[in-house]
């Protein structure tokens, strides 16, 4: 068996994508490496091993992949947070800020019950607009947001600090400077 890789070295960096000056952090290489993916999930769930977490909420789309694995490890339910218009049942909706403008996300109104302990999961946190919207959405229906977990943090963009200012503990596995 080969040794476990340094997780940050498994993430592919694509310069100037999706626009010039951006260094895109592509986690598909990490997801495709069984050892790295397992280690990533293990590290994300470690602080809550043995804790009572009711649900894991994942943000569309890569948050579904990581969040599903985290929910499985914690024996918790999984809740998808999707772009508006993608869920078939009655939903609750929240607007959130994008770099240029805003959008809306939603979840099923009965996906989380008041007082349930929820961990929010996504692949990456940059400016924090989407994660902030997801936290507000979860709180709107009465969830107790225990933490937000991300594989990658881009600390220069301030998203993790934005969530901490909302009283949400943030767990990340790696960080990259720049955009």
From Swiss-Prot:
- UniProt-listed Pfam families: Pribosyltran
Entry's EC annotation: 2.4.2.7
Pathway in which this enzyme or protein is active: Purine metabolism; AMP biosynthesis via salvage pathway; AMP from adenine: step 1/1
Q: Which UniProt keywords apply?
A: Cytoplasm, Glycosyltransferase, Purine salvage, Transferase
Subcellular location, record wording: Cytoplasm
Q: Biological process GO annotation list?
A: adenine salvage; AMP salvage; purine ribonucleoside salvage
Molecular function terms, GO-annotated: adenine binding; adenine phosphoribosyltransferase activity; AMP binding
Establish whether keyword Lyase is in the entry: no
Q: Which domain of life is it from?
A: Bacteria
Q: How does it assemble?
A: Homodimer.
Q: Tell me, in a sentence or two, what this protein's role is.
A: Catalyzes a salvage reaction resulting in the formation of AMP, that is energically less costly than de novo synthesis.
Q: What is this protein called?
A: Adenine phosphoribosyltransferase
**Species of origin:** Azorhizobium caulinodans (strain ATCC 43989 / DSM 5975 / JCM 20966 / LMG 6465 / NBRC 14845 / NCIMB 13405 / ORS 571)
